[in-house]
Amino acid sequence: AYHETFEGTYIVARETGNKAALSTYVNNSAVIGSSYDAIKVVKMVGHLPFFAGLKGDKALVIGFGIGVTSSAIASHTQIKRIDCIELVDGLKDVAHYYKGLNADIQYDPRVNIIAGDGRHFLLNTREKYHLISSDPTHPVLGSGNLYTRDYFELCKQRLAPGGMVSQYLPLHKLRQQDFSGIIKTFHSVFPDATVWL
């Protein structure tokens, strides 16, 4: 599937050499695929807060993508509402290609998909969330402002009492000092944070 929109060009294609696996590209950069390695990570981002004892029923997902993280969060029945922010609005329209992985989450009545920038949303909303799951694209693909102290502070301001932030951070294509710097920055805002690899 090929689509051009104001936000950019996005493509869903079969992975070379693996007819069963799909990849989604935004502006010619692979952002997510259906391979086991890709999916286990985004599912983990959604599930870990619950394993850590998350209480509450309202979640915010920054980076809806193909909906797998949102689907993982929705699988926990305590969740009554999930607001999902996605910069490339059209991605929700191709999420159905991944329905075996996301349980058609885009049609779940608890889910509200909002087109826009995650940081801008946090600046302008007054909502408080029990979980903020930040699952942006790789920082080298233009989402670097979603890995900064300013962004983490915004997340903290939008947490309900006892709330948690789950932050995706890739290991690939990231220099050691950049990876360490992001971890230190996150930990400076959330001193009780744990890192899962």
Task: Go through each PLM region and give its residues.
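A general structural signal for short secondary-structure junctions and capping/turn motifs
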Residues: 2-4, 13-15, 52, 73-74, ...
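Basic, ligand-binding patches in group-transfer machinery
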Residues: 1-32, 36-39
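A Trp-anchored, charged/polar loop motif used as the substrate-binding/catalytic surface
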Residues: 7-10, 116, 193
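Ordered hydrophobic segments in well-structured contexts
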Residues: 11, 23, 164, 194-195
